[in-house]
Amino acid sequence: VDEDDRARLAEFVASRTPALMRVAYLLTGDRHAAEDLFQSALARTIPKWRTLRHADPEGYLRTVMYREQVSWWRRLRRRREIALTGADEAVQQDPSGGTDVRLAMRAALRHLPPAQRTVVVLRYYEDLTETQVAEALGCTVGTVRSRTHRAVSRLRQLLPDVELLEVRP
């Protein structure tokens, strides 16, 4: 990686880290695990930076994070460890109730199967289209739609007091 590439990489990392860390947190449900996931994905992305700089480096990094997390879930399942993370970080009361809804949504996301959780994160937190999600996950648009439908149905069961917006393609 030459000096020009290093400068572009540093600029990319500085500008996109907050958004990508949010995705990592939503995938893992844990701040420390999110940091590890992001750093691991970034380490795998840097050697390919020269070829990515003109394409979609953020999309590539997001896909690497997703695949790394799926590998972790699979290893966890093989060991038959079931570990749900505990307490959310302490927050001040939000008079509008927005914080409570966000915390409830984070907790509910942890109860979704990994594939459904990932689709929800990419569709609604990252605001990707169904086509973009399908490309990132290496599946069909129909699969994205069915996972989204099942995930939203489950979230409605888990959060009966939270009004979820209608899901549209």
What are the residue ranges of the model-derived segments?
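Short amphipathic alpha-helical boundary/capping segments
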Residues: 9-11, 104-113
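Short, charged helix-capping/linker segments at alpha-helix termini
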Residues: 1-11, 21-40, 48-55
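Residues within helix-turn-helix
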Residues: 32, 131, 142
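Arg/Lys-rich amphipathic alpha helix in sigma70-family domain 2
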Residues: 63-84, 97-98
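Structural recognition of an alpha-helix C-terminal capping motif at a helix-to-coil junction
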Residues: 36-43, 47, 55-67, 146
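Residue-level preference for hydrophobic side chains embedded in well-ordered alpha helices
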Residues: 12, 16, 20, 41, ...
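DNA-recognition helix of helix-turn-helix
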Residues: 137-161
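A short pre-motif secondary-structure segment
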Residues: 119-123
